[in-house]
């Protein structure tokens, strides 16, 4: 076998890599048609779970819903379905088969809806898609949701797929980090990223001994978001980045073991939350910012545009207070929380879409609310934090 010379290997490696940074070239979102109004949800939830006798707990749940700052949430689960599946309405009853039967079919379908919108905005033939990254915390199956999406969209059988299951709320940052690496290390790559989340795996009735589970029932919702990611946009073909990704990092916060846990059991996906999650995140967030922005010489956090996973209003409040952020910094984040709830991994991608939409509507100079540099944060089980440095583009 003839060994390649170092220079030719270097040339091959260079030829395989993109020249410029990865950019988000298109965004699409989708939600189930069925939705609930948060102010009405406590009455509905305690009625459908046959828990109206738990009057004190219902009052606590009402306060949770009031404090959530959520106006409405989309949910695939309808009242009719829940009436036919009473085990899903209990706090702990065997129900995994019924839950799996829903999500194995519906997660790829909802993902397809978002992907079709992203591909339409991108404006290129879907045959140009080289990679698929699919992320969900809703159910597991083989072949996975990545395979089902590839079939639903009619993508090439040679498309390179990556399936991420059971990551939780930080994973909107993870998919960006992975897509960035794929796009920048494979010249001409176009990565379809899809996060699709359906709460059929986590829905359950109330328990007065597990209030952390009730927090999830007040926050979680269904949604899917899709991106096309690629480097070296083909301007002549009509490609144009919406945001560019400059760097991406992941870290496990110190002293945070067990702060957020999820366990897939016969009863579905159980959710456990420690009270001090907002404190753990706000205490450690500046270190992540320092590490991410020191190379750029940026230390004024109000000079950035902000996209933060809206785990709940307490997290956003604590981060704002700790960093001295102006109230408008979290506008896009709080808007998505209000209108959609906590859609786990899909949230930050919805916020990207909301930010670019409002930037165009307001006539500001860039896709990042008129600012040049921004940060995207994902928070979730671990506690794991994803930090993505973004560069906006002119509107």
From Swiss-Prot:
Record's Pfam families? Chal_sti_synt_C, Chal_sti_synt_N
Its pathway is: Secondary metabolite biosynthesis; flavonoid biosynthesis
* Organism listed in the record: Sinapis alba
Q: Which InterPro entries match?
A: Chalcone/stilbene_synt_C, Chalcone/stilbene_synt_N, Chalcone/stilbene_synthase_AS, Polyketide_synthase_type-III, Thiolase-like
Instruction: Mark the transmembrane ranges.
Output: none
What role is this protein assigned? Answer: The primary product of this enzyme is 4,2',4',6'-tetrahydroxychalcone (also termed naringenin-chalcone or chalcone) which can under specific conditions spontaneously isomerize into naringenin.
Superkingdom of this protein's organism:
Eukaryota
- Gene Ontology molecular functions: naringenin-chalcone synthase activity
Arranged from A to Z, the UniProt key words for this protein are: Acetylation, Acyltransferase, Flavonoid biosynthesis, Transferase
Q: What's the protein name?
A: Chalcone synthase 1
**What is annotated as the active site?**
169
Record PTM N-acetylvaline, positions in chain: 2
Q: What Gene3D superfamilies does the entry give? A: 3.40.47.10
The reaction(s) annotated as catalysed by this protein in its Swiss-Prot or TrEMBL entry are: (E)-4-coumaroyl-CoA + 3 malonyl-CoA + 3 H(+) = 2',4,4',6'-tetrahydroxychalcone + 3 CO2 + 4 CoA
Q: What is its EC number?
A: 2.3.1.74
One GO biological process term: polyketide biosynthetic process
What family is this? Answer: Belongs to the thiolase-like superfamily. Chalcone/stilbene synthases family.
